[in-house]
Amino acid sequence: MTASTALWAQGPNIEELFKKAGAASDANEPKARQYLYREYKVTNEINEKGESSNRHTETWEAIGLEGSEYRKLVQRDDKPLREKEQKQEDEKLRKETDRRRQEKKGGIKNPLKRSYSFGYTKGDERFFDFRYVGEEVVNGRPAYVLEGKPKSDVKPTNNHEKQLLLSRLKLWIDEEEFFESNFEIEVTGAGVDIRPGTMVAFKQQRMEDGTWLMNEMRVRFILKPLRIANVRMEVLTTRSDFHKFAVDSRILERQ
């Protein structure tokens, strides 16, 4: 076995890989803010038998409003909103439009905001020991696959860190652009309320211009509030109809 073959067999340098992934994420963020989308969310409440006891859906439109993103509810359970709720949404939009216009007059610029949280942020990799487990093809693109287990010698200082140290990670990092294309975090140890099996997974889609956008997120909650009974809920969020908008909120193109 040659030296180069042996190096490849060991996989990529994980520390360098995370540095490149962090830089790719930073470079992608302003480009991602230029995109709007349509969002479809399915929420399932699961009973003790593992059956769906309550299912409902919501459809949202992310629109450009005074130069930034605004999420507008347009359907509930695959049907148009009832008249009363539609009026409430219209009133919310009117008030938000007025608020943003006042901010503009005052010289305050609203950045785009994302409404989701993954329970894992940049820098949290320091709580895990990672190993390279191979390669997989994600949406036709080769990706490095890493698995992370919580470090045994780290003591948490807050609830977020406690959650991390009760979880396992799996990451897919694009080999060409070093962007984190897929991600999974699953709770494996019992905390105060969150139970093992609680999970968040998301997938990213690459646009023609090289921008990466989240197009699917799966969340499974297994909670035991007040230590009384398990509450289980599954949420699937998909995004589609991505399109750019300008600072003046005019739609430019669809992909």
Spans of model-derived segments:
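N-terminal signal peptide c-region/cleavage motif recognized by signal peptidases
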Residues: 3-4
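Structured extracytoplasmic
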Residues: 9-167, 175-182, 186-198, 206-213, ...
